[in-house]
Amino acid sequence: MAGSNKSGLVGAAARARQRAVAPYSRFKVGAAFLTRSGEIITGANVESASYGLTCCAERVALFNALTNGKKDFVALAVVARAPGGPMPCGACRQLLAEYAPKATVWVADSRALTVVREFTVAQLLPGAFLAVPGDSD
């Protein structure tokens, strides 16, 4: 993928990060998906006092995209203030395996806005559980 697409997607994730609602952890995360048609869809983490209700930036961006009819994702950028790059949690990895299995995932530190690490979804979640719709015994 062209470097300009990568830097543009990281920039979109960084802008989304500014809209994060993280009053408890103060760990703000932004995410941006790139579709094959070139559209960028973003999201930011939203926290709740009941931590189990908190939603990660990756899931917010994914749900935003899916509920607006967007799919066929080619890349995801995730940005936070994390020297080694903000790694997607297990729940986000599962949803990526289901809805964006061919996407390249870039993680970037918000201070430099350069990609720290790059992964395929299969590298993030090897042996992912994928149910077969309608499969029953």
Where are these regions (language model features)?
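Active-site segments that bind and position negatively charged phosphate/pyrophosphate groups
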Residues: S25
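Compact, glycine-rich, soluble single-domain proteins
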Residues: N45-R59
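Alpha-helix C-terminal capping segments
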Residues: L34, F63-K70, E98-Y99
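Stable alpha-helical structural segments in soluble proteins, enriched in small hydrophobic residues
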Residues: L9, A13-A16, A57, A61, ...
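C-terminal binding/interaction regions
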Residues: A2-A22, K70-D137
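Short beta-strand scaffold segments in enzyme catalytic cores
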Residues: K28-T35
